[in-house]
C-alpha cells in the first residue's frame, strides 16, 4: 500500500469570518460573535472571532459568558486608562491596542445558516478549480481533507 498525503483545510472561525466579510470588516481583527441575541443570554454562540477569543472567550460560549468576560476586561481597562476613565468603545483590535481609554465592544451577528451553506459551496467551487472532486473529502461546512498524493507525485518528476 502506498503512502498518501492529505491536506486538511479548516476555515478560521468560519461563521464569524463570513459575518465580518459581509460587513466589510477584517475577520482577524474585529470583535464579533455569532449568536441569536433575540433569545436569552443563555443561547450558545455559534462562533467567536479570533480577536474576541484573544480576551479569553472560548469558541462556543453562551452569550452571557461573552457579556461577562467583556465586562471583566473593560473593568481592567478602565483601571489602567488615563484618569481611570473609558472615553469610547471599539470592536477593532488595532484601535483597542492603540487607545487604552477605549472599552472593548463587539458585534452580535444573528446566525444565517443558509447563507453560510452558500458561501461554503462557493469555496468548494474554488477547490474544484485545482483539485478533482474525488480527491476532496468534505468533513463539515468549513473543513475538507484533500488527497494531495497524485498532485505531489507529479512534482517529483
Task: Locate predicted features.
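Gly/Gly-Pro- and Ser/Thr-rich, intrinsically disordered tail segments characteristic of DNA damage-repair
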Residues: 1-156
Amino acid at each position: 500500500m502506498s503512502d498518501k498525503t492529505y491536506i486538511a483545510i479548516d476555515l478560521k472561525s468560519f461563521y464569524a469570518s463570513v459575518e465580518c466579510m459581509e460587513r466589510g470588516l477584517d475577520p482577524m481583527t474585529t470583535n464579533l460573535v455569532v449568536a441569536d441575541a433575540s433569545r436569552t443570554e443563555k443561547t450558545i454562540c455559534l462562533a467567536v472571532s479570533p480577536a474576541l477569543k484573544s480576551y479569553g472567550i472560548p469558541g462556543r460560549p453562551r452569550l452571557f459568558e461573552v457579556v461577562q468576560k467583556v465586562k471583566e476586561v473593560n473593568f481592567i481597562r478602565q483601571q489602567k486608562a488615563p484618569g481611570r476613565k473609558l472615553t469610547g468603545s471599539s470592536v477593532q483590535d488595532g484601535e483597542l491596542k492603540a487607545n487604552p481609554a477605549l472599552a472593548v465592544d463587539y458585534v452580535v451577528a444573528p446566525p444565517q445558516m443558509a447563507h453560510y451553506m452558500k458561501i461554503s459551496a462557493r469555496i468548494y467551487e474554488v477547490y474544484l478549480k485545482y483539485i478533482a472532486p474525488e480527491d476532496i473529502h468534505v468533513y463539515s461546512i468549513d473543513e475538507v481533507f484533500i488527497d494531495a498524493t497524485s498532485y505531489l507525485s507529479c512534482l517529483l518528476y
